[in-house]
Amino acid sequence: MATVQADSKITIVGSGLIGQFWAMIFAGGGFKVTIFDIYPEQISKALENIKATLSRYESQGCLRGSLSASEQAALVTGCNELKKCLDGASYVQECVPESVDLKRKVFEQMDPFITEDMVVATSSSCICVSQFVGNLSHKHRTLVAHPVNPPYFIPLVEIVPGPWTLPDVTAKCRALMELVGQSPVTLSREVAGFALNRIQYSIINECWNMYKDGLLSAEDIDKVMTDGLGPRYAFIGPLETMHLNADGIVDYCNRYAQGAYNVCTTFKPPPIMYDVPTAEKMLQEIKKAIPVDKVQERRTWRDERLAALAALKRNLKEKTD
């Protein structure tokens, strides 16, 4: 299987926040990165933000890779000519907003410049690649590589091949993600919402129903995750939890399957629509702790703690390796 070499060029299509994170991740791995945007001023803004963010991460001790912040920033350049950006690239990560029509337009523009040794991934969080590449001549070089926000501190990447994606393209994408320190999972085929959002939406569905039924306050619902499931799931997943909570997963099923089934029969059938009246009621509770005009401050708080958790997990892994 061919791999993306360390001296390869990587192109990011879209200069928004996710595109900037991808650029920093690849630069941290020592790759030369080119960011494409049709607006030069957006490119300049992105490059300035990347430089400042890398410098801040370095001062906070959470910079990834062996290169300094200035060395990593020097690896990232910008260009507003698509053909020039794609020329010589081994890997392309599209990061435009979540719109089928927009993604179709962008991929149609890229198609003439895609080569047979190039991997072209979309950062789509729910839209399958087959929904917008079906008419492309290079659709077999495309797939989903969905990051989790913020991807610099949450390493999971969902790799979802389309029905035409060549196996080597999928394998090459996964190898690259591992090389730059991400944690890829590969789905065998397309499914709506991929893996993470199918699990996440299942959780939100039940949280929404419990709140509407008056079972718990918004604060207590979040506490169930932050002080209950969350700490455990930060280190072991639900299947390993089953395995450890009995004498193996088979023993867990023998002991608890009927009880779990009985609980599940009380669930309201999905899907549900997250309705505005319920959201407005939730907001009255949530904004007491986090006013809407303080959301950005809370995001910064979140990222700082995710960075600390990432460092902790990395240190623990190094001790056990």
Language model features: what each stretch is:
Residues 1-56, 60, 113:
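NAD(P)+-binding Rossmann beta1-loop-alpha1 motif at the extreme N-terminus of oxidoreductases
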